[in-house]
């Protein structure tokens, strides 16, 4: 079956447009990938958001002076569409030689265009470089599982059968790994990320979680679908009282994508990690 992104700019030579062109945005319906996981828009078992950070955002004042900022875009996890990443980059680049009356005027334009592409209201923040610099590099709480000794014999497909838990011991903890890697389903390029699991329920075997995450290493899918698959596999195993899964992916083309899925309506921290 042809991937829905095959008609997008991904993997193709693209002309870089330097004047405002909202038609560059390429939405991709979430429906097909939800169906692969046995889900529909009416049966999503999670809440969440996809946070995109843009580090290559610039436009002109009415006097022709360039301005730069860091953009933060929050796309609801239940929006009908995701936005294909290269088209997102091309759209943002189209602002470079376009003049806007104010920062707020640009923010309103971005919100309008991105919400139209996603099919749901998208949150937009334009932040100064000093503001972001003051936050520094984030450090994750909880336990890093990357030094656990595991044997790995498969990387092609996610292997939820590797996951183990102790049903007789209920815990509340946060586990994380910097070893998440998957691949773009169109170009095959690697997507590197940090994966955070925060839960309350039967104790998850950390080594089994690490082996499971490593099994994504040659898997081809978008960031958002990888996180949803991980969330569902953990939910099926643990039947937890609380669960959130958060991936902080390394940026590409000036954009990083950070999908968050949770049983609760909680806004995740958006502080960048060391590889971002």
UniProtKB/Swiss-Prot annotation:
Pfam families in the record, alphabetically? QueF (PF14489), QueF_N (PF14819)
**Catalytic reaction list:** 7-aminomethyl-7-carbaguanine + 2 NADP(+) = 7-cyano-7-deazaguanine + 2 NADPH + 3 H(+)
* Gene Ontology CC, one term: cytoplasm
Q: Which residues are recorded as binding NADPH?
A: 85-86, 252-253
The metabolic or biological pathway listed in the UniProt record of this protein is:
tRNA modification; tRNA-queuosine biosynthesis
Spell out the catalytic residues.
184, 191
Q: Where in the cell is it found?
A: Cytoplasm
Q: Which GO terms of the molecular function aspect are on file?
A: preQ1 synthase activity
UniProt keywords, alphabetically: Cytoplasm, NADP, Oxidoreductase, Queuosine biosynthesis
Q: How does it assemble?
A: Homodimer.
Annotated protein name in UniProt? NADPH-dependent 7-cyano-7-deazaguanine reductase
Gene encoding this chain?
A: queF
